[in-house]
């Protein structure tokens, strides 16, 4: 039996790819004005409308330990192997819930902190699933996941910091001071920490940085395997980023709506550029 690959709904992935590669996605949930929704049940566009209308910041929740245990028991027999790759513990307790669920299930589960989320998490999950489908061993898959993790960059742009302030996460972004709600901020997720790269006023902050990123990639000479762009009502900049960066990678760049978990913290107008280097 091929090794089973599991992840969570903080991943941003094309549904067709998940089906084709038999990737099991365990849904996180979000509570808006007292009503809990599973990521399975709430379309992203509907979520953004509900979040905008809500007086309070939605509350995101990791899957319960018991849900992970049930999933593992359902998809694999006792002798089968499972690799479960998840949202970084810097942002959620999902990894720990998966570990406990693995122990409870009695299955052979290896749980991995992706150190990332969104399409940066997808890079690891998709490659693991492709290798599993091809009959690779657990050791081969884990080695490849580690390589991708160590050669991935994630940049994120915030058009507003209102949700970060409400969620108490601004303190996690070093270097943020002053008038927080009016600035544009670009950060990076590295070594399980969200750090500030740049801040300024107006959308020109994003476009100037994009030029600098392009110049940096050009001068580095590093080859790129894949680029993913995700956004929360930040399509205009995302399309410009694809236009600027497509020349660096053969594979077409995916522009996707992010997920409810990430959008809760970023607020509207946010985007992320994720780069998987060869």
Curated annotation (Swiss-Prot):
Keyword rRNA-binding: no
Keyword Metal-binding recorded: no
GO molecular function: lipid binding
InterPro entries: DegV, DegV_C, DegV_domain_contain
Alphabetically ordered keywords of this record: Lipid-binding
Pfam families: DegV
Alphabetical list of SUPFAM superfamilies matching this protein: DAK1/DegV-like
Record domain DegV: where: 3-277
Residues the record lists as binding hexadecanoate: 60, 92
Transmembrane parts of this sequence: none
Annotated PANTHER family: DEGV DOMAIN-CONTAINING PROTEIN DR_1986-RELATED, DEGV DOMAIN-CONTAINING PROTEIN SPR1019
Family annotation (NCBIfam families): DegV
Function: May bind long-chain fatty acids, such as palmitate, and may play a role in lipid transport or fatty acid metabolism.
The protein's name: DegV domain-containing protein YejH
Organism this protein belongs to: Lactococcus lactis subsp. lactis (strain IL1403)
Gene: yejH
